[in-house]
C-alpha cells in the first residue's frame, strides 16, 4: 500500500482576450468513473441570422423570441439569494495580498478558484483540519459552506456562447483503497466534479490529469500544466479550473494605440498602450492610490489601481484600503467623482506559477500539512496517516483591445492621494499597478500585479 502522502497543487490561468467555449462532451476516458453535469443554458442569439440578405430587413420579432429565451436562461442561472457571498469578503481581502506576494515581479491569481478548491478540500477532511478551512472561509459549518459554494458556482458559471465563465472540478482517487461515497457524491452534486480512479503517480494517470487541465483551461496554461505530476505516493488529487472570457462593454480602438515608456522596476521599456476617454467616468481614490474600472459585457468589471508616486503595489495591498473599496464600499464611498478620464492602459500578458503552502498556513490552514495532525477520515475512514504535501497555483492574465480572457485551475493531490482635479484626469498606467476582475456579484475572479507588461 502507498504511504499516505497528499500533494496539493493549485494552478490558475487568466487571460484577457475574446471568446471561449467548453469542450464538447466525450465518452468517459479510461479511469473516469463519474461524469460532471453542467447546467444547460440557452445560447446568445446571433443577430446576423435574423437579417434577410435580399431585403436587408431585420426580423426583430423572431430575434426577440430567441433573446427572451436566452435572457430567461441567464436569469435562472444567476438568480441566487441576496447576500449569499457576504461572508466571503473578509477571506478575499485577507488572502489576496498573501496569494500575490507569493510571486516575484508580475503576479496573478484567481481568488474564486482558490476558494472553490478550499471548499472541496473541506469536503474530504474532518475534525480540526476541516474546521481550520471553514474558519478561513468564514463558514459556520459544512452545511453552510456547501450551500454557499453551490450558490457561488451557479452565480458564476456561464456557457452561452457570448461570455464564458466555465468552472470545472475533478477528484482523482487511488485504486485499491476504500473511500466513503458521501463526500464523493457531494463533490459531484455541488461542485459538478468528475471522478477518476487509477494508479496515481504513473505516466498514464499523469497524462490524463494534464489532458483534463489543458482541456478545461483551453490550453492557456499548457506550459505550467506540463510540469504537473503526481508523486507515486499520492493517494488523492483534487483539481479545480476556471476559464473566463468577456468583451469590454466599449472596446478599445487599435487605431488609438500608442507606443510609450513603462517604468518597470528593472528599467524602462517600450510597450503598447491602449487609449480611451471615459466621459464622466467614475474615479476613485484613497490615501495611497487612484482607481478606475472598465465594464465588461457580462456585468463584470476590471479595476485598475495605480499607486501614488513613491508607493508600490505591495504598499497598496498592505494598507488594505483599495481592496476594502473594491470588494465592499465602492458604490457608497465619498472618495469618488465623475470626471473625464483619459485612460492609457498597457496591453499585457502575464503568468505566475507559485506554491501556496506558506500562504495558506499563514491564513490559518496548518493541520492538513502535518502528517501527525491531518484528518482525511471524511473520505478515507480506515486510512493511515496522510497529509497535504504541495499547493501549486499558476495564473495567467492577458488583455487586448477587445476584452478579457481568464482561466484558472487548482489541483490538490493527496499524499490617494490628493483629491482629483475638478473636471479631467490623465490616468496613465505607466508604472507598476494592480488589477482586479470582479464578477457582477462583486466577487474577485482574478487579481494581479503588473510590474513588466
Language-model segments: residues:
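Detector for small/aliphatic-rich hydrophobic stretches
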Residues: 15, 20-199
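Short Gly/aromatic-enriched secondary-structure transition segments
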Residues: 133-137, 252-261, 313-323
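Internal alpha/beta scaffold segment
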Residues: 307-337
Amino acid at each position: 500500500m502507498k504511504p499516505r502522502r497528499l500533494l496539493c497543487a493549485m494552478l490558475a490561468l487568466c487571460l484577457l482576450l475574446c471568446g471561449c467555449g467548453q469542450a464538447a462532451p466525450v465518452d468517459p476516458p479510461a479511469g473516469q468513473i463519474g461524469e460532471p453535469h453542467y447546467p444547460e443554458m440557452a445560447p446568445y442569439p446571433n443577430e446576423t441570422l435574423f437579417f434577410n440578405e435580399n431585403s436587408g430587413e431585420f426580423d426583430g420579432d423572431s430575434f426577440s423570441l430567441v433573446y427572451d429565451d436566452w435572457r430567461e436562461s441567464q436569469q435562472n442561472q444567476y438568480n441566487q439569494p441576496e447576500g449569499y457571498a457576504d461572508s466571503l469578503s473578509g477571506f478575499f481581502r485577507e488572502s489576496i495580498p498573501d496569494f500575490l506576494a507569493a510571486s516575484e515581479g508580475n503576479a496573478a491569481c484567481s481568488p474564486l478558484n482558490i476558494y472553490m478548491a478550499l471548499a472541496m478540500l473541506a469536503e474530504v477532511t474532518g475534525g480540526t483540519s476541516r474546521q481550520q478551512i471553514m474558519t478561513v472561509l468564514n463558514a459556520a459549518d459544512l452545511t453552510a459552506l456547501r450551500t454557499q459554494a453551490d450558490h457561488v458556482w451557479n452565480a458564476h458559471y456561464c456557457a452561452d456562447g457570448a461570455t464564458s465563465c466555465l468552472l470545472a472540478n475533478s477528484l482523482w482517487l487511488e485504486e485499491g483503497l476504500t473511500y466513503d461515497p458521501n463526500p464523493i457524491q457531494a463533490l459531484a452534486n455541488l461542485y459538478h466534479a468528475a471522478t477518476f480512479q487509477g494508479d496515481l503517480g504513473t505516466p498514464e494517470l499523469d497524462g490524463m490529469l494534464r489532458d483534463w487541465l489543458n482541456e478545461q483551461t483551453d490550453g492557456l496554461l499548457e506550459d505550467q500544466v506540463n510540469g504537473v505530476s503526481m508523486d507515486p505516493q499520492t493517494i488523492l488529487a483534487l483539481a479545480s479550473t476556471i476559464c473566463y472570457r468577456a468583451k469590454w462593454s466599449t472596446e478599445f480602438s487599435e487605431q488609438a494605440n500608442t507606443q510609450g515608456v513603462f517604468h518597470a522596476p528593472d528599467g524602462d521599456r517600450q510597450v503598447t498602450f491602449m487609449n480611451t476617454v471615459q466621459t464622466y467616468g467614475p474615479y476613485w481614490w484613497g490615501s495611497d492610490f487612484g482607481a478606475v474600472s472598465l465594464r465588461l459585457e457580462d456585468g463584470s468589471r476590471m479595476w485598475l489601481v495605480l499607486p501614488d508616486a513613491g508607493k508600490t503595489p505591495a504598499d497598496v495591498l498592505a494598507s488594505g484600503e483599495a481592496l476594502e473599496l473594491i470588494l465592499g464600499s465602492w458604490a457608497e464611498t465619498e472618495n469618488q467623482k465623475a470626471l473625464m478620464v483619459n485612460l492609457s492602459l498597457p496591453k499585457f500578458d502575464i503568468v505566475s506559477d507559485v506554491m501556496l503552502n506558506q500562504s495558506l498556513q499563514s491564513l490559518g490552514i496548518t493541520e492538513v500539512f502535518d502528517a501527525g495532525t491531518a484528518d482525511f477520515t471524511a473520505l478515507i475512514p480506515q486510512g493511515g496517516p496522510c497529509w497535504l504535501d504541495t499547493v501549486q497555483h499558476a495564473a495567467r492574465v492577458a488583455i487586448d483591445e477587445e476584452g478579457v480572457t481568464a482561466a484558472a485551475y487548482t489541483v490538490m493531490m493527496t499524499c490617494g492621494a490628493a483629491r482629483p482635479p475638478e473636471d479631467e484626469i490623465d490616468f496613465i498606467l505607466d508604472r507598476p499597478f494592480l488589477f482586479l476582475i470582479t464578477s457582477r456579484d462583486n466577487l474577485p475572479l482574478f487579481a494581479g500585479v503588473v510590474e513588466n507588461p
